[in-house]
UniProtKB/Swiss-Prot annotation:
NCBIfam families: S16 (TIGR00002)
Subcellular location per the Swiss-Prot or TrEMBL entry: Plastid, Chloroplast
GO MF assignments: structural constituent of ribosome
Keywords tagged on the record: Chloroplast, Plastid, Ribonucleoprotein, Ribosomal protein
One of the record's GO cellular component terms: small ribosomal subunit
Record-given protein name: Small ribosomal subunit protein bS16c
Keyword Plastid appears in the UniProt entry: yes
Coiled-coil region(s): none
Predominant place of localization: plastid
Family recorded in the similarity comment: Belongs to the bacterial ribosomal protein bS16 family.
A matching Pfam family: Ribosomal_S16
Miscellaneous comment in the UniProt entry for this protein: Although originally identified as Cyanidium caldarium, these sequences derive from Galdieria sulphuraria.
InterPro entries, sorted: Ribosomal_bS16 (IPR000307), Ribosomal_bS16_CS (IPR020592), Ribosomal_bS16_dom_sf (IPR023803)
Length: 77
């Protein structure tokens, strides 16, 4: 089953997250199928590739709770 979730990246105590599509059995920092955007919680900067996100949602990918909240704020879902 595909999940749209956050993948941690960045330096220690300066984290940022990539929004990726992964198999739900893979590790959090494992290999992603595709990157859909990024989010930096420290600077509130974020980028979402809406076309790719909608494509994977149509294929049946389920967003995690945090990603679901991000998509709601961006009015994608």
């Amino acid at each position: 089953m595909l999940k749209i979730r956050l993948k941690r990246c960045g330096r220690k105590k300066q984290t940022s997250f990539k929004i990726v599509v992964m198999n739900n059995l893979d590790k959090r920092d494992g290999q992603a199928i595709e990157e859909l955007g990024f989010m930096n919680p420290r600077t509130k900067e974020k980028y979402l590739n809406i076309n790719k996100i909608n494509h994977y949602l149509r294929l049946g990918a389920k967003p995690t709770k945090t990603v679901f909240d991000l998509l709601n704020k961006a009015k994608i879902i």
